[in-house]
Design a protein with these regions (language model features):
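Transmembrane helix-loop-helix hairpins in multi-pass inner-membrane proteins
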Residues: 1-43, 94-205, 290, 294-353
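Membrane-interface helix starts
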Residues: 13, 17, 47-56, 225-239
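Hydrophobic/aromatic residues in alpha-helical transmembrane segments
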Residues: 26, 66-74, 110, 248-255, ...
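Short, membrane-interfacial amphipathic segments enriched in basic
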Residues: 31, 202-220
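A short amphipathic helical element positioned immediately N-terminal to and/or at the very start
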Residues: 39-47, 216-229
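Hydrophobic alpha-helical transmembrane segments
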Residues: 53-57, 84, 88-89, 125, ...
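Membrane-embedded helical hairpins/re-entrant loop segments and their flanking transmembrane helices
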Residues: 66-96, 255-277
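Transmembrane helical segments that form the transport core of multi-pass membrane transport proteins
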Residues: 224, 228-281
Length: 353
């Protein structure tokens, strides 16, 4: 038994190291591709004003307020005693573990902290996966709407990339559609069970994982059926997600407008066009399977914006965007995780006494 457990630990460590190696490789490729612009990029970053840093910090808080409210809306439907503050804290817990584990620990952390708040694990699993699916579908719809509104600008500026952009959008829509179908269409569970039985016959060692996946799918569909009965709740979730994405998508515009010598009138695009390009970068990066989106967001963002701006400006903006959407939430989340651990230890001591 101990040998089996140690094997699992070694396997998880190996997976993490492979992810880390893959991320380092991606970042190395990005550095090699843009090393000629590094000096100019560092100069651009050194000119960032304290006001911009404050705006970036506020955008992180607003994003997690929205994310926490989304969690609360979903959980509150069946567990009215769940407080809003727990949802806000849960958002930062997930952000910390998402970065610390390169993406794989976010879902586990979300389910774990929902369970600590009194939500049974099966329900917490279904709720978290439903929230993830709503997130993906909302992002795809928002990005598609912005793409259509600014289509003339995108067609004129990126005619060479248009085929790839449309192909990427098709991928985004397929992923969102499949996730939505898995969560809501009853026969999808039957199809997945048939596939699991086929795989189980070929690979008996997969029995435990396939059984666990089957249970999670059943929990997801049960929670989805319950939540889909409330159209007003779905509308609120969609609008909250749009507001949440907006707090991220305005970051490049703020950075570009506050660069020395640049103002809104000096840029080759309007606020809406910049907003749409950022949304497009984030959505298309989701099609590329990289840990926590590291490397893919940077590559797509830089590829699009460097056709309109000097490469150094595009690189400095994407670095600040990544800092705000990944590193800063992780740093703030670390304090939330530490605080939760301290509170848990105090509770255990009181119980022991």
């Amino acid at each position: 038994m101990m040998r089996h457990d140690s094997g699992k630990v070694l396997s998880s460590i190996l997976k993490y190291l492979l992810k880390l190696l893959f991320v380092c490789l991606l970042l190395g490729i990005l550095y090699y591709s843009f090393k000629d612009s590094m000096e100019d990029m560092i100069t651009e970053l050194s000119k960032v004003s304290p006001q911009v840093i404050l705006v970036l910090f506020l955008s992180v808080i607003l994003y997690h307020l929205c994310e926490g409210h989304i969690t609360w809306l979903i959980v509150h439907k069946t567990h009215p005693e769940y407080p809003r503050l727990k949802g806000f804290c849960n958002a930062f817990y997930c952000s910390f573990y998402k970065t610390a584990t390169l993406g794989s620990g976010s879902g586990i952390a979300g389910i774990y902290y929902l369970n600590k708040a009194g939500i049974p694990v099966p329900n917490a699993t279904g709720m978290y996966f439903f929230q993830y699916i709503v997130h993906k579908v909302s992002m795809a719809v928002y990005s598609l709407l912005l793409f259509l509104v600014t289509y003339r600008f995108i067609h004129t500026s990126f005619a060479y990339y248009q085929g790839y952009i449309l192909l990427g959008f098709a991928g985004v829509c397929v992923i969102a559609g499949v996730l939505l179908a898995v969560a809501t269409v009853p026969w999808m569970q039957t199809a997945c069970n048939l596939l699991a039985n086929h795989l189980r016959a070929k690979h008996p060692s997969w029995e435990e994982k396939l059984t666990g996946a089957g249970h999670k799918l059943a929990q997801l569909q049960a929670e989805s059926r319950s939540l889909l009965k409330d159209p007003l709740l779905l509308l609120r979730l969609f609008l909250c997600n749009l507001l949440k994405f907006t707090t991220w998508y305005i970051i490049p515009w703020m950075v570009f407008c506050n660069s020395p010598g640049d103002g809104p009138g000096d840029l080759p695009f309007s606020f809406l066009q910049c907003f749409a390009l950022t949304s497009l970068s984030q959505s298309l990066a989701g099609v590329i399977p990289t840990p926590a989106g590291i490397g893919s967001v940077e590559a797509v963002f830089t590829l699009l914006f460097r056709r309109l701006l000097p490469e150094a400006k595009a690189l400095s903006a994407v670095l600040l965007y990544r800092f705000t959407t990944m590193l800063l939430p992780c740093a703030i989340g670390a304090f939330f995780v530490l605080g939760e651990r301290i509170v848990s230890l105090h509770r255990k001591k009181r119980t022991a006494d």
